[in-house]
UniProtKB/Swiss-Prot annotation:
One of its GO terms (biological process) is sister chromatid cohesion. InterPro entries: P-loop_NTPase, RecF/RecN/SMC_N, SMC, SMC_hinge, SMC_hinge_sf, SMC_prok. One of its GO terms (cellular component) is cytoplasm. ATP binds at residues 33-40. This is Chromosome partition protein Smc. Residues 202-528, 692-1046 form a coiled coil. It comes from Synechocystis sp. (strain ATCC 27184 / PCC 6803 / Kazusa). Contains large globular domains required for ATP hydrolysis at each terminus and a third globular domain forming a flexible SMC hinge near the middle of the molecule. These domains are separated by coiled-coil structures. It is found in: Cytoplasm. SMART domains: SMC_hinge.
Amino acid sequence: MVYVKRIELSHFKSFGGTTAIPFLPGFTVVSGPNGSGKSNILDALLFCLGLATSKGMRAERLPDLVNNTFKGNRGSSEASVSVTFELHDGENLSEPGANHNGNGNGAKISKEWTVTRRLKVTKGGNYSSNYYINGETATVTELHEQLNELRIYPEGYNIVLQGDVTRIITMNSKERREIIDELAGVAEFDRKIVKTKETLTEVQDREERCQIIATELERTLERLAADRQKAEKYQALRQQVQEKQGWAKVIQYKAVEQQRQKLWGQLERDREQSQQIQQALDQRSQAIQTQQTELEKLNAQVKALGEEEQLAVAAQLATQKAQRDQLQQRYNDGDRQITNHQQQVGQIQAEISQSQQQFLHIQQEKSFHNTQTLPQLEAAVQTSQQQLEQLRHQAQAIASASEAWVQEQTQLSRTVNQLQDELIPQRSQLAQLEERQQQLLTNLAELTPLLTKVSVELEEKQFAQGQFNFQGEALTSQIQTLASDLAQLEQERSLLQETQTRLLKEQQEKQRQLDKLEAASQAQQEVQGTYATKVILQSDLPGVCGLVAQLGQVEPQYQLALEIAAGGRLGFLVVEDDGVAAAGIEILKQAKAGRATFLPLNKIRPPKGQNPNLSYAHGYIDLAVNLIDGDRRYADIFAFIFGNTIVFDTLVNARNHLGKHRIVTLEGDLLEASGAMSGGSRNQRSGLRFGTMVSEDTAEVKQLRQRLQDIQQVQGRNEELLLERTVRSRQLTQQLMEMRQQQREAQLHGEQTERDIARLSQQQTQINQQQINQQQKLAELQQNLALLQQSLPPLEQQLASAQQQLTALETSQTHQQWQTIQIQIRTVEAEYQRQLQALRQGEDHLKDLQNSSQRLEEKIAQAQEKIAQHQAQDLTLAQEQEQLKIALAEMNGAIQTTEAQLAKLSEKLGSTKQERDRLETQLNQLRSQQQEQQWQWEKLQTNQQEYQENLTQLQTQLEALEQDLPDPWPEIPLLQDRDEANLDFANILEELERSIRNGQKRLEAMEPVNMLALQEYEKTEARLGELSEKLQTIAGERTELLLRIENFTTLRRRSFQDAFDAVNKNFQIIFAELSDGDGYLQLDDAEDPFNGGLNLVAHPKGKPVRRLSSMSGGEKSLTALSFIFALQRYRPSPFYGFDEVDMFLDGANVEKLSKMVRKQAQQAQFIVVSLRRPMIEAAERTIGVTQARGAHTQVLGIKL
C-alpha cells in the first residue's frame, strides 16, 4: 500500500525551523488551536506535489509561503517541503525524463520515494521554485507523470480544503457537470473532435476549390462546344470530299479493269476449260494408276487376306484375353486374401476363445491345486515321515542285539542314507534349476521382441504427443489472436451501432425541427402567395415561362429601387397564353395551394401613358422599365409591371415632382402619383429578387438540411462499416468455434496419447525390470547350477561305493529281522521320497500354471492385435477390388470390339474377288476416255496465245493508274449491292466528280474554322473527369471524417455516461450512510448531458426531497462531502487529506462523517485536520499542533 510516510517542512509558512512529521497508514487526525498552523501541513502537501497554485494555499504569491522571520545569506530566504512515500512491494516508478513508451524498462527504486520542492526568494522579491525526486532535479510535468502512476492526480480530490466544499455548494450546475467531464476524460475527446473538424474544414476547402475549378471547366466545355461542333462538321465534310476523291480514283481504275476483266474472262474460261480437260486427263491418268494399283492390291489381298491380318487381329484378341485373365486372377487373389483373412480372423477368434477357455481351465486348476492337491500331498509326506521315524526306532532296537554287525551295517546304512539325503535334494534342485533356467531363457526371448514393440510404439506416441502439443500451442495462439480480433471487432461494431442509434435519434429530431420550419415557411409563403407559384413551377406544366423576377436582370445599384417599385408583382407567373393560365388555376384548385396571378403573353397589355420627359430634372436616372435587361418578348410584361414609374437618385430630388409621376428612389423610397409617400429603414428582405427563385431558405433551414445530409452520408457509410463488421464478426466467430473444436479434439487426442505414453512407459519399465530381474535370476541360477554340477559327481561316487559295501555286508551275513526292517525302512523311505517328489512337482506345476496363465493373456492380446491388422488390410483390399472391377469392365469392352473386327475380316474375304473383277472393267473404260480428251486440249492452247497479247496492253494502262490508288481501297456505297459487271463506270465517275466539286465549295464557305477546339474540348473533358474522380475521393474522405467525429462523440458520451453512472451509484450509497436518507445525481438534460448541468438531489431522513440550493448549511456540506467521497471512490488514490471539512456540521453528522472516513481508511490513508471531538476519537492516531511561544508552529506530540 502506498502512503505518505513523512513530511518535512523547512521555513514553510508558520513552520520556522525544520520539522519532520511522520505518518502511518490509516486514519490520522491533525488537531490544534485556531491559527496554530495545522492546515499548513496540507498546504505543504499541495505545495510539494504541485497540486495547487499559491491562492489555493491561501497566499497571494509564492514568496508569501516563506516564513517571514527567516532570512538567509545576503537577504535571501528559502522554504522547502519534502514528502516521503512508502511504496508497496514491487511498485515501480520510471525515472524522471525516462521514456514512457510502456516497454516496462523503468528503473526500480527503493521502497521510499521522496519529492522535494524548494522555493528561493531573493532580496528584490524575485523567486525560483525547483522540484526534486529522490534528490534529482525534475520538472513539474515529470513529477505529475510519476504521481499519475501512483494514482495521485492534480485535477482530483486528493486534498479537500474548506473552500472545495464551499465551491461545490456554490458552483452552478454546469460547472458541477464539468467535474464529471474531467473525470471521464471528455476533454481528450473534445480535442480529438476539434482536430478532426479542422481536418474536415481543410477537406471541405479542398472540395470547394475543386468544385470551383469543376464549374469553370464546365463553363469552358460549354464555350468550346459550339467551336467543337463546327470543327467536327468541317472535319467530317473534308473527310467526305477526300473519301469521294479516293472513290473516283478507284472507279476510274475499275473502268479499265472492267475491260481487262472481260478479255481476261474469255481467256480464263478457255484456260479453265483447258485446265479442266488437263485435270480430267490427269485425274483419269491418276484414276487409271490408282485402279491399276488397287487391282494389284486386290490380287495380292486375295492371297494374303486369309492369313496375315486375320492372324494379327487374333493375336491382339489373345493378348487382351490374357490381360483380362490376369486382372481376373488378381481379383480372385484379392477375394481369396479377404477370405483367408476372414478365415484367419475366425481362427484367431477361435484361438482366443480356446485360449480364454484354457485360461479359465488353468485358473480352475490352480484353485483346485491350491485348495486340495497340495494340502493332500503335504499330509501324505507328514504321514510317511512319521512311519519312517517309527521304523528307524525299531531298527535301532534290533541293532542292539548284534552290536558289531549292526554297527557296521548301521554305519554304512547311515552313510548311504546321508549321501542319499544329500544327493536327492541336490538332484531335485538340479532338475528344478535346469527347468527354471529354460523358463528364464524362454521368458527373456519373449520379452525382447515385446520390449522392442513397446519401445517403437512409445516413440510413435511421444512423437504424436509432440505434434499434438505443437498443434495445441499453434491453435491456442490462433484462438487468442481470433478472440482478440473478435473482441476488437465487437467493440468497433458496438461503437458503430451506438453511433447509428444516436444519429437516428438526432436525424428524427432535426427532421422534426425542419418540418416545423418548413411548415411555418409554407404558411408564410401561402400568405405571400409564393407557395402557389412554387406549386405551379414544380408541376412541370408546359407553357410556364417563369416568375417575373426570373425573367430579367438588373444592375445591383438599381435592384433595390426596381424591387420596391415592382413589389409583389415580381411573384406573378408569366405563361405563354391564357390556356396555360387556366390550366394553372385548375391545378391550384385541385391542390388547394392558394392563389396566383398569371400573365399570359398573348393577352397582356401594358398601360397606356405618356413618356415623361424629365431628363433635364436633377437626379433623374431613367424609366424603371428601361433599366431591366431581359428577352424582348417579355417587354410587355415589364411594361405592365412598372408602367411609367421613374427612378430618381434621392428622395430630395424626387420630391420636386411629387404628385405628377410615380417615382422610386435608389434608397427604396416610393412616391405615388396620388401624392402618397412610403419609405423608412430597410429590414433584411426575404421576398423575391431579380434573378432568384421563389424564395430562399433561411440560415437555420440550410443548417438543418446540411446537418441532415451529413447524417445521411454518415449513416450510409456507418451502415456499410457495420455490415462489414457484422459479416467479419460472424466469420471470426465461426473460425473461433472451429478452432476451439479443433483445440478440443487435439486436447482429447493429446490426453489419450498421454495416457498411452504413461501406460507404455510403465509397461516398458516393467519389461525392463522383468528383464533385469530375469537376468539376475538367470545369473544366480547358472552359478548355483554350476556349483551343483561340480558337487554331484563326487557324492554319487561315494554313494555307489557305500551301497556296494552295504550290499556285500548284507549278503555275507543275513539277519532276517534286520533285513526285514531295513526293507520296510527302504520301502517307507522310497514312499517318502516319492511323496516328497510329488509335493515338489505339485509346487512346480503350480508355478507352471501361473506362467501359462500369463502367456495366455499375452497370446490373447497379440491375437486381438492381429485381428485389427487383418481388418485394416481387408479395407485396403476392398478398395483395390473396386479398381480391378472397373479395369475388367474396360477390358471386356475392348475384347468385344476386337472380336467384332475379326468377324468383319472373315466376311470381307469373300467379297474381295468380286471387287477385283469390277475394277478391271472400269480400267479399260478410263483408257478410252483419256485419248478423246487429249485432242480437245491441244485445240484450246492455240486460242489462248491470241488473248494473251491483248491483255498485256491493258495491264500496262492499269499499272499507271494503280500508282494513285488509296491503300487500302475504301468501301464505295455507290457500288454496294450492285453487280459491277453490268455497271457503266463512266457515268458513275462523272456524277461523283460533280459531288466532289460541290463539297469543296461548302468547305470554302465554312472557313475559317478553329480545329484546335477538338483537342481543347477533349483535354478539358478529361481534366473534368479527373476532377470528378478527385471530388468523389474527397467526398469519401469527408464522410470518413464525419463518421470519425460521430464515433468520437459517441465515445465521449459513453465515457461520460459510464463515469456519471458510477459516481451516481457511489453517491447514493455514501449519502445513505451519511444522512440516513437517499439522494442521487440528476442531469438537466439526460438525452444530451453536455447541453445542461448536474444537480445534487437529496432526501434527508424526515424531510422532503430537495435540491442543493434549497438545503440548510449543514445539509449542503454533508451532500457536498458525499459527492466528494463518490468522486474519490470512482478514482481512488492512495491517500487523502481533509482540512476542517466538518466545521459546518453538527455533532451527530460529524460522528457519521468520522465513521465514513474510518471506513474509507481501510483502503487508503486519510490525513484529516479537525477540531471536532467525534473526528478525533474516531482516528487511529492524533497529531497535536500548536504555536511555539506565539512564533512558529510546533508538533507537540503524536498519539499512536
